[in-house]
Amino acid sequence: MAPLPLCFVTSSKKKLAEFLHAVGDNTIAHVSMDLPELQGDPETVAREKARAASRIYGGPVLVEDVSLCFNAYKGLPGVYVKSFLTAVGPSGLCNMLLPYEDKSAYALCIYAFCDVTVDDKPALFTGRADGRIVPPRGPQTFGWDCIFEPLEGGGKTYAEMEMVEKSAISHRGKALEKVKAFLTNSGVKVPCVK
């Protein structure tokens, strides 16, 4: 049986859109898979998600895990940002920092590549964007984009940017550049990578 092509695993349509924008529309297989929300540091969470997804898919996968880290909270909500967003929304996240002068934060994206048919040691590709938390601005259509103003963003939140502008400076865009370099040089069966 021929090896399976690389599959990007996500249940988020917005993450998928940004991923396909970066690597080329419809060039990599993708599947929606609800993986368990794990606890731990960002690297451990990404590794375990990749292993689990590769076991289910039966071949090479790429998964993404994102953290939003408030410096005033020593890195929280971090990998738990999805749970915080579900509970309190973007405004609630922003309000967590009301008692603090320090509104600085960083966004962290980790892509993990794993193929359990070869080995179970995921390769990690990390991107980070420093910025600050601001009251919601722009469309509230993708997670916490409307409250994160990256230092490189010219005073705009991610939500106020076009995808091309955001991808050039975002945590996800920085991590994806590393993923593209890896895929270009790895020999992994990928139909096409821009």
Curated annotation (Swiss-Prot):
Record note on cofactor: Binds 1 divalent metal cation per subunit; can use either Mg(2+) or Mn(2+).
Protein name as it appears in the record: Inosine triphosphate pyrophosphatase
EC nos: 3.6.1.66
Cofactors that this protein relies on: Mg(2+); Mn(2+)
One Gene Ontology term of the molecular function aspect: XTP diphosphatase activity
Subunit: Homodimer.
InterPro entries in the record: ITPase, ITPase-like_fam, RdgB/HAM1
Binding residues for Mg(2+): 37
Lineage: Eukaryota, Metamonada, Diplomonadida, Hexamitidae, Giardiinae
Function: Pyrophosphatase that hydrolyzes non-canonical purine nucleotides such as inosine triphosphate (ITP), deoxyinosine triphosphate (dITP) or xanthosine 5'-triphosphate (XTP) to their respective monophosphate derivatives. The enzyme does not distinguish between the deoxy- and ribose forms. Probably excludes non-canonical purines from RNA and DNA precursor pools, thus preventing their incorporation into RNA and DNA and avoiding chromosomal lesions.
CDD domains attached to this UniProt entry: HAM1
Organism name: Giardia intestinalis (strain ATCC 50803 / WB clone C6) (Giardia lamblia)
Catalytic activity: ITP + H2O = IMP + diphosphate + H(+); dITP + H2O = dIMP + diphosphate + H(+); XTP + H2O = XMP + diphosphate + H(+)
